Amino acid sequence: GLKFRLYQNRDVEFIDARDGSGRRVYVRSLCFVLYKASCDVFPGSKLFIEHPLSGGYYCNFKKRGNEPLTDDDVNHICQRMQEIIDQDMPFRRTEATTEEAVRVFSERGFSDKVKLIETSGQIYTDYYMLGDTVDYNYGPLVPSAGYLKVWGLERLYDGLMLRVPDKNNPLKLSERVDMPRTFEMFAEKVRWDIIMRLSNAGDVNKAILRGHASELIQVSEALQEKKIVKIAE
């Protein structure tokens, strides 16, 4: 894996954004730049990278006061992202005990990150800083923001669409196809998660640790059966 440390001679294979692991490194890093830019432009806002969609990832973005997102807002975030990339701002990795990492995120009020880290089962936890912005990523990032040459950001529905490079040709953006039915399917899943009080992966982990795994599976299967019946109609 990309986090494996070498202590003796090994064969090393270099990868780029055409490789699945390399692509995930690129996307994680780009998401962090978007997160920092949104925090810088709109302090107190909340950004959730929700799910993949054709050409990129749909993001739920809530401004403080729940004001509607505008095209000008998106342009301001884009400008800040480009500034971060042009400055080649470094991603600074810190390895800490999980207890220390929990404290870092607790002090900043990131309860979702705290839940995820607490349920990771790891003794040590890596977290990253981009400028003065901290985030937890389940995997490595690129060394600095200057590596992120290909990306796009646009308003989609009530949120943001983060465009990412094409998996076969990372020098150009992946083609985006409008997929309203797929989007509605994901939106319904989010609504069910809210009903079940599962707003993030940490909530799911805690539910499993409390012995509710079978209940989660049964509800998910019931929802899936409902969707299959609807398709058959």
Q: Language model features by range: what are they?
A:
Residues G1-V25, A37, K46-A232:
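Auxiliary tRNA-acceptor-end handling modules of aminoacyl-tRNA synthetases
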Residues L30-V41:
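Short amphipathic alpha-helix segments
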